[in-house]
Amino acid sequence: MRLFKKRNTISERHVKANKRAEDLVPSGLMQRCPNCGLEFFARRLDKYKTCPDCDYGFRLTARERLAWLCEESEEWFKDIQPSDPLHFPNYEAKVAAGKKKTGLNEAVWTGLAKIGGQETALAIMDPFFIMGSLGQMTGEKLTRLIEAATEKRLPVVVFTASGGARMQEGIYSLMQMAKVVNAINRHKAAGLLYLVVLTDPTTGGVTASFASEGDITLAEAHAMVAFAGRRVIEQTIHEQLPKDAQRAETVLKHGFIDRIVLRQEEKETLAWLLKYGGMQDD
């Protein structure tokens, strides 16, 4: 029985990590691509923050994306603040952390912008603000943006990046799905263009509502596009999903996305679509 109680020390005898040396390695020196697994020096990332091997787009803050996407921009509705209708424990602290991390008042930047010289109403969701979750005021900002675009007869471009509905706001969060989609339907009824760009991750209630309503739907390479999480599905069907089941390429293959666009090509592609797809007869 002593044999089974013997401690395995092979790794301790043959692989000894130098803890002091590890402490000398600067934080953030290396990056690992979550899609292909490539490890590379972080300095290889440019403003687009894409993997040098597979073109996976690392997550960006709304302001990082705004910096290379638009020549001009004007933020709208920046005074709208998140609400706490359920007085959820620690929610205010999460909101404060999200504000500090992103410089935004909510999980979405909204405003007027010029992309390749084309004027548009623009919304960019920020995955670093409570995972880009859809809260009551997130929905309010999106709805006001779309309604203003309808009134001014402007196209709308929305970049989605979200973990879904914000659980800390309960039913108030879920109501935003219908609210935003209704605004989109009125926008479309006015003969105006609505473009969506799906980025990593686009999931949950956002996928089930305004992310799926685009006249034209683009997606970034290898972005996660899903409704329920992988573990939830696997535990329900008692089967393991294919590795790429919730990737943009698979969603494209099944007809729910029109095209996958590399980040370096997004500005040019959107400018072309806005120029020719967003033209309106006076």
Swiss-Prot record:
The superkingdom listed in its UniProt entry is: Bacteria
Comment on bound cofactor = Binds 1 zinc ion per subunit.
What are the boundaries of the signal sequence?
none
How would you classify this enzyme at the top EC level?
transferase
Give all residue intervals belonging to the CoA carboxyltransferase N-terminal domain.
29-282
One term under GO cellular component = acetyl-CoA carboxylase complex
Keyword annotations for this protein? Answer: ATP-binding, Cytoplasm, Fatty acid biosynthesis, Fatty acid metabolism, Lipid biosynthesis, Lipid metabolism, Metal-binding, Nucleotide-binding, Transferase, Zinc, Zinc-finger
Molecular function (GO) terms for this protein are:
acetyl-CoA carboxylase activity; ATP binding; carboxyl- or carbamoyltransferase activity; zinc ion binding
The UniProt record lists the EC number as 2.1.3.15
C4-type zinc finger segments:
33-54
Instruction: Tell me the pathway.
Output: Lipid metabolism; malonyl-CoA biosynthesis; malonyl-CoA from acetyl-CoA: step 1/1
Subunit structure, per the record?
Acetyl-CoA carboxylase is a heterohexamer composed of biotin carboxyl carrier protein (AccB), biotin carboxylase (AccC) and two subunits each of ACCase subunit alpha (AccA) and ACCase subunit beta (AccD).
- Family affiliation: Belongs to the AccD/PCCB family.
Any idea what job this protein has? Component of the acetyl coenzyme A carboxylase (ACC) complex. Biotin carboxylase (BC) catalyzes the carboxylation of biotin on its carrier protein (BCCP) and then the CO(2) group is transferred by the transcarboxylase to acetyl-CoA to form malonyl-CoA.
**What is the protein name for this chain?**
Acetyl-coenzyme A carboxylase carboxyl transferase subunit beta
Q: Which organism is it from?
A: Lactobacillus delbrueckii subsp. bulgaricus (strain ATCC BAA-365 / Lb-18)
* High-level lineage: Bacteria, Bacillati, Bacillota, Bacilli, Lactobacillales
Q: Gene encoding it?
A: accD
